[in-house]
C-alpha cells in the first residue's frame, strides 16, 4: 500500500471514529493539546505505566491501554500513523506527539521512517495480546491493574476544562513523585491520559482531598482508640433473664457472705444495683460512712493474745476495744452477738478484733490508696469514768470521708462504756503493759510522721506546679508544718529525684485547698495561746488525729472538754470549718455548747461544754427505759433538731452515740461532722452519709432527701431505747442496707406491749415516704409528748450506766 493510500485509509478511519463523539467536544479537546513530542520507538521498554503530559502535568497509564478494545478510544485514532511492529517484537512501545491542528500529521523525521511500512495487523494483535498477558501477570504497584478500558468523552472534557486547569496542575503534584518512580519518559497526547472509571474514582478522591485542603473544608475527625483504658465495673440487670450483668466475682461473694440470696436479688434488682453502686463508690472512696462498718464485724474477731478483751456478759458495752481510728462508729456490738457469719465476712472487716501486742498495726479495711498510712490504735490507759464523754468528743465529726481516723472512742463501739476500753484494766493480759504502750505509741508516732511528711511533700509539689512564685501566705503557713524538718529533709531528695506519684483528683483538691482552709480557720478561731487559758488537762480519749481532754478554765474554774485535732491528719479539713460554724451558730439548750476554738501550732483546739454523764448509748445498753423516759429523750432531741432545721441544717447522724447527757439528766446533741446546709435553692441532698443502721430509706437508695432523714433516725433511736439496739444490728452492714431499702418500716419486737400513742408516734416517724413522714414540729405536738417524764428521772439511769461500766472494767481487769 502506498503512502498516499495509507494516509487516506488512516484519514477515513479517524473520521469514522470521530463521528461517534460529539464534534464540539472532540474539537475542543484536540485543540487543547500542547504536547510537541513525536512518536519514538523504544525497542526493549518493559511493561509499565506510561505518562501523559499536558504542559507540566503527567498521568500514569498502563501499557495495556495502548490499544484498548473500546472503539471509542482515542488511542486508536490519535492523529498519527499506525505504527508497524518490526519483527513482531511485543516489547516495543509507541509514543505519539500531539499536533497543533486537528488533522495535521507529524512531519518529524522520527515518524517518517514508519511511513510507508506495510500494515501488519496480525503482528500488532499478537503484540497486544502478549503485552496484555504480561501486564496481568505483573501489574504495576500504582495505579491498580485496570480492568476497564472505556473512556468517556465527557470525563475528558471535564478534566480539560479551562476552569479546572489551575487546580489540576496543583493536584497532580501530590501524586507526581510516586508516579515518576514507576513511569518512563514516554510521552503521549494529553487526551490519551484519560483514566478509566476505576482510575477516575481515584482521581476524584485525590481531587476532593486537594479541594478540601485548599478551601479548608472540614474533614471527618479521626478519633483514635483510647490509650491505657481502665475498666470500671458496671453492674446492670437483665429483665429477661433475671440475672445481674457485669457483677464482679467479689460482689457476688460479698452478697452471698452478707446473706443476700439470689432470690432476694431477683425480687429487688434495682435496689441491689443501687446498693452495690454505693458500695463500689464508697468501699474505696472518700466517704467515712463505709469505714464505719468496721465495727460491725469487730466483735466477730478472736482477740488473740488478749484474753481480757473477751466478753463476759451480754450487756457488756459494745464499744469496747475496737479503738480503730478509721472505724465505723457504729453500733456497739449488740448483746446477742451474731455467730452465724461465715469466715469470709471476717475478711471484709479489718483485723481489729483486739489490739494484738508486739504486732504491727493492722491494715485499714479500705484499699491502701485511701490513706498513705494509718496510725496504730493507741491503747487507752486507765481513766476515770468520764471516758464516755471524752470519746464522744474524740469523734472526728470533721470528716465525712476517708476512714477519718475517727477518733477512736466515738461510737458505741468505742466511746461510752467501760467496755470501750477493756485494756484499761488488763495488766494481766500483757506481760509488760509499759512496753506494749511504748510500742504502740512509737508505731503511732511513726505513722503520723509518715502521713505528715507525705502530705507536706505533695502540698509543696502542688504549689510549685500552680505558681513558680510563692504566695506570701504559703511560706508562713507551711512553716507551721515544718515541725518534722529532719524527716521532711530526708524525704525531699527522693521526692525530687522521681516525680510525685499521681494522686487522685480528690487528694489534689484537698492539698490545693489546705492553705485556704487554714487561712479560714485563722479568721474563725480566737487568737492566743490556749495553754495559758486552760489548765490541768486530763486526757480522756485518743484518736489518730488527736486527743480529747478535760480541763479547767482560768478564772471561772469551769470544767470544759477540749478536742485537739492535728490538721495535717484531717482528710477533709473543710468539714472542720463546717462543724465549727454550725456549733457557733447553734446556741440552744439541747445542743452541746461551743465555747471557743484556737489554732495552736499544728493543732486545732475546739473547746466545748463538758457533758460528764456520757452518751445515751450507755444508758440504753445497761438500762431498761420506760415510755416516759423515752418520751423525754425524744422531746429534747426534737427540740434540738427543730432548732437546726429552722436554720437550714440537717444533722444526718442522729443516733444514741451522738446524744450526750449530764449527771442531772440534761440532753444535748453533738457531733456535727455530717451536717449539711440546705436552703431554698438547694433544699435536697443525695449524698449517702451517716451510720447505716440509722439511715433513712431515701438515703440508702440515694434519692434526694431533706430534713425528714433526721426524723427517721430519731424513730430508729426510739426503737434503740426500747430494745437496746437498732434494727438489723446483728446483720452485716450490706445486708442491713438491703433490708432498710426493701423492708421499709422495721418491725418492733413485742410491739403489742407498747401503748397505742407510742406506736402511733413511731408510725409517723418511720414512714417510708418522706412526704408523709412527720416533721420535728409535728412530733413535738404529738400526744406522746404528754407522757414525758421529768429529766431528773434520767439521772438515775446515767448513774446506773456509769456504775455498770465501772464494774465491767473491773471484771476485765481481774480476768
UniProtKB/Swiss-Prot annotation:
Record PANTHER family: SERINE/THREONINE-PROTEIN KINASE SAMKA-RELATED-RELATED, SERINE_THREONINE-PROTEIN KINASE SAMKA-RELATED
A GO molecular function annotation here is: MAP kinase kinase kinase kinase activity
Its chief place of residence is cytoplasm
The UniProt catalytic activity note for this protein reads: L-seryl-[protein] + ATP = O-phospho-L-seryl-[protein] + ADP + H(+); L-threonyl-[protein] + ATP = O-phospho-L-threonyl-[protein] + ADP + H(+)
Keywords, in A-Z order = ATP-binding, Cytoplasm, Kinase, Nucleotide-binding, Nucleus, Pheromone response, Serine/threonine-protein kinase, Transferase
Q: Which family does it belong to?
A: Belongs to the protein kinase superfamily. STE Ser/Thr protein kinase family. STE20 subfamily.
| Active-site residues (renumbered) | 653 (proton acceptor)
Which GO terms fall under biological process for this protein?
bipolar cellular bud site selection; budding cell apical bud growth; cellular response to hydrogen peroxide; invasive growth in response to glucose limitation; negative regulation of gene expression; negative regulation of sterol import; negative regulation of transcription by RNA polymerase II; osmosensory signaling pathway via Sho1 osmosensor
User: What biological function has been recorded for the protein in this entry?
Assistant: MAP4K component of the MAPK pathway required for the mating pheromone response and the regulation of cell polarity and cell cycle.
Give the record's GO CC terms.
cytoplasm; incipient cellular bud site; mating projection tip; nucleus
SMART domains registered for this protein in UniProt: PBD, S_TKc
Q: What is this protein called?
A: Serine/threonine-protein kinase ste20
EC number, as in UniProt? 2.7.11.1
In what ranges is there compositional bias, type Low complexity? 68-82, 394-407, 429-455, 494-504
Where ATP binds, per the record, is at 540-548, 563
Ligase as UniProt keyword? no
